Structures are given as structure tokens and as C-alpha cells.
A protein has these predicted regions:
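C-terminal "post-core" interaction segments
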Residues: 1-260
Length: 260
């Protein structure tokens, strides 16, 4: 299961099991997969209808994927235009354009990108969001673009609890770091297994003489809070053991502190 949610009305908790940053949009050859943005729209509507007081986002088994899904979730938890996003620098190369042809069409101020240069990922004309966009009541299931929540009136106003483990890596850790640096919710669980600032998005190729498959990072991710760049790991607000064989200690903590 990539992701699924459950509403616990008695405890006034919505539990979102978020196992991988992947869906139908990131894997277009698998139309049977759900779309994360559609699931979020349904989830938030049900949360509002049932007046749920706490959203728990479980990332302890999430090793990453496409960071766009983290941006989708954050758009429901914090005003999009006031969110400070992780800085993403990307080096444009022939290999990048070969593997991701969209970069051939990307522009900055209507000028094409130059091979070999490093760019701010969010400075491209094509990656700037339309801040006038509102999610329609009856969203179209065959839309070709992700549906961000840009309506501040729909921002979730309850408690938000993220569960982190040593295995919460890559895009998962980026989401946790973005939430922390924007003051969204609290993090419980284990200290992260990687640096909040890191290289990512690996491009794979085959060496012509040896046929060895190699990978090269094309992006560097820098956290929002520059005062914390020295931190080697993301330490949770509340440290809770996750591998107790007898008890689910983190869930017990959540019920004790947020369950009705």
C-alpha cells in the first residue's frame, strides 16, 4: 500500500499511513494506482465533516520517492504562498534532458536552460504555481496536473503529528524538515537516519567501455532554516521507541496526548 487513511471518530484522529512518495502520476504506466491529490481531497473533506481534531502522518516506513507528493500534503497544512520550501538546486545536463525531456522545454524568463548550469528548481517559468487557482467542488478525475490546495480557508486547523523513523529518508525527510522549519505540527519517533540537507534525484547511465551501471545526483536539497544547517540529523520533538516487540509505544503516546 502506497498510502491510505483511516478516520477514528471516537478518538477524533485521522491516521494517514504514508509509505511511499509515489502514485498514478509518478507511475503513468500503472493506471490502477490511486492519485495522492485525490485521496487528500477526500480525506480532508471527511476530516472537516467529522470535525476530526488530530491528523497523524505516519512516515516511519517511507523511504522517499517524488517530493511533489510532500508538497501536496503541505498545501493542506500551511498556506501555500506563505510556506518556505526546501531549496532545490539542479544541474542541467544532456543526461538529465535525455531522461527527463521536460527540461528541454523549461525556461527562465522565457529563455531556455543552458547545459552545465545550476538552477533554482522553482525559478522555472513552468514550476511557478498559479496562486489564483481554487480546487473545484467536483474535481475532474482525468486531469493531467496535480491539484494543490491553494484555498487558505481549507487549511487544516487541528493538531498534526508526524511519525519519523531512521528509515524516513529522502523525500520523506524533506517533508518532515519542511514541516519543522515552517512550524507545522510536531515530530515523534526516532532521530532521522540522514542529513536534512542532502544530494538526491539520481540519474543512471551505462559506462560505454565497461557496461557498468552508475548513478549521479543532479540535485542538492537545502533546508529552509539556514540557522540549522549544522544539524546532521532531524531530531523529533518527542523521542519514542519504535521497535518495541510488545507494544506500539508511539501510538500509545499519541492516544494518551491527543485521543479524546
Amino acid at each position: 500500500v502506497l498510502f491510505e487513511y483511516e478516520i477514528l471518530e471516537k478518538e477524533s484522529i485521522c491516521y494517514l499511513q504514508f509509505n511511499q512518495f509515489a502514485d498514478r502520476m509518478t507511475h503513468p504506466n500503472h493506471p490502477e494506482l490511486p492519485r495522492f491529490d485525490f485521496v487528500l481531497i477526500d480525506m480532508m473533506k471527511e476530516i472537516e465533516e467529522k470535525n476530526i481534531g488530530t491528523l497523524v502522518v505516519d512516515l516511519q516506513y517511507n523511504g522517499g520517492g517524488n517530493s511533489a507528493l510532500g508538497k501536496l500534503l503541505m498545501s493542506w497544512l500551511h498556506p501555500f504562498d506563505k510556506t518556505n520550501w526546501t531549496d532545490v538546486d539542479v544541474r542541467v545536463s544532456d543526461l538529465l534532458c535525455e531522461l527527463y525531456p521536460k527540461y528541454r522545454d523549461y525556461t527562465i524568463n522565457e529563455k531556455p536552460l543552458e547545459i552545465g548550469k545550476v538552477y533554482d528548481m522553482f525559478s522555472f517559468d513552468q514550476t511557478k504555481p498559479n496562486m489564483d487557482y481554487k480546487i473545484p467542488e467536483g474535481y475532474v478525475q482525468d486531469t493531467s496536473n496535480y491539484m494543490l490546495n491553494l484555498d487558505v480557508d481549507k487549511i487544516y486547523k487541528g493538531n498534526v503529528v508526524f511519525i519519523e523513523s531512521r528509515g524516513s529518508l529522502s523525500s520523506s525527510e524533506m517533508l518532515l524538515t519542511t514541516a519543522r522549519d515552517n512550524g507545522v505540527g510536531i515530530i515523534v519517533g526516532e532521530t532521522s537516519g540522514a542529513n536534512p540537507c542532502n544530494y538526491g534525484d539520481i540519474l543512471y547511465s551505462i559506462l560505454p567501455n565497461t557496461s557498468i551501471r552508475v548513478g549521479t545526483s543532479c540535485k542538492f536539497f537545502t533546508r529552509v532554516n539556514k540557522d540549522l544547517l549544522h544539524e546532521e540529523y532531524l531530531v523529533p520533538d518527542v523521542i519514542v521507541e519504535l521497535d518495541d516487540p510488545e507494544k506500539d509505544l508511539v501510538w500509545e503516546w499519541i492516544l494518551e496526548n491527543y485521543g479524546k
